[in-house]
Amino acid sequence: MNYLVNYCKISFYFLMSISLSLFLISLKFLLMDLVYFIEWEILSLQSMSIVMTFLFDWMSLMFMSFVLLISSLVIFYSNQYMEEDYNINRFILLVLMFVMSMMMLIISPNLISILLGWDGLGLVSYCLVIYFQNVKSYNAGMLTALSNRIGDVALLLAIAWMLNYGSWNYIFYLDMMKNNIEMMIIGGLVMLAAMTKSAQIPFSSWLPAAMAAPTPVSALVHSSTLVTAGVYLLIRFNDVLMNWWMAQFLLLVSGLTMFMAGLGANFEFDLKKIIALSTLSQLGLMMSILSMGFYKLAFFHLLTHALFKALLFMCAGSIIHNMKNSQDIRMMGSLSMSMPLTCSCFNVANLALCGMPFLAGFYSKDLILEMVMLSYVNVFSFFL
């Protein structure tokens, strides 16, 4: 067991140190307005070449640092939360595979390498959802996998359409050809892929179902990293969303998702599903502000939301663990007396989610409201 504990701790210290260094580097990139584009050729066949490309700018480095920070804390949390599990070694390896897939997605300006990270996320999340290997987990895992397949097919079709341009490095073509019909089709396909991964209507059923996974997985995968991959992809493709019909369609869908998730959470008794539905409403908020053209604001809310939602899930995991694995909120009472520290952290995260002044959620949500009020589409959104 000591070997496994050390394995967890090594992963924790390694990921945490990389996270802090990447955060400092991203601040330097932001202040100096630096962008590094690294490309090398893997294979060349006559006029066709396969190249591996990485894009390092402040946005990708900062998002990577946040993903690594939450991953390291989740691994540290799993050290004791899952210490009775025989397969904790396999669990940590799956989490590390997930982090690698997420890194691949974040730093790729190339649709093919994005697909590698995208499919890696889908596969590893399926393995993590079915981790407990019972009928409920298998059903939830299949629903998760099949819902995400639609987005994978849309991304493959976008790769096929990119052949019209002669390269898959979409970042070169977004600004120049954003009014072309081909780029509109590619943008529509990317938007469909992002809607499946970020669980917008009509693909939102898989996110509450994926709560069959262990709680550390919910804290990492289904709150802060996997579900925000779709939002991050749309942030990268934000020039294509300047098309008015795409933006209005996305605004309508995300508004409906917010409404549906908020309404559904009122009638739910499962603690983890309530938090999952709040994640869904926050994803709807990110998508709606993205459709109005404020992509940096969507990124800011993505970062703040990741932190307090991971804390919410970890506190929920602690409560469920002490309730002898019962997730029914009707069975919980007087928790503030028996678990004061956990309840304090839970309430802090809850107030941040509500937008309490001077907590993380306040800064992003207040900015979002201010920008929407001052925006020219505010009449449409108010009527919505």
From Swiss-Prot:
GO terms for cellular component: mitochondrial inner membrane. It comes from the Eukaryota. Its EC number is 7.1.1.2. Changing residue 5 to I: In strain: Arzag. It is found in: Mitochondrion inner membrane. One of its GO terms (biological process) is electron transport coupled proton transport. The chain crosses the membrane at residues 12-32, 50-70, 92-112, 113-133, 153-173, 183-203, 215-235, 244-264, 274-293, 298-320, 343-363, 364-384. InterPro entries: ND/Mrp_TM, NU5C-like, Proton_antipo_N. Its main location: mitochondrion. It catalyses: a ubiquinone + NADH + 5 H(+)(in) = a ubiquinol + NAD(+) + 4 H(+)(out). Keywords: Electron transport, Membrane, Mitochondrion, Mitochondrion inner membrane, NAD, Respiratory chain, Translocase, Transmembrane, Transmembrane helix, Transport, Ubiquinone. It is an enzyme of class 7 (translocase). One of its GO terms (molecular function) is NADH dehydrogenase (ubiquinone) activity. Pfam families: Proton_antipo_M, Proton_antipo_N. It is a multi-pass membrane protein. Belongs to the complex I subunit 5 family. Core subunit of the mitochondrial membrane respiratory chain NADH dehydrogenase (Complex I) that is believed to belong to the minimal assembly required for catalysis. Complex I functions in the transfer of electrons from NADH to the respiratory chain. The immediate electron acceptor for the enzyme is believed to be ubiquinone. This is NADH-ubiquinone oxidoreductase chain 5. The gene is ND5.
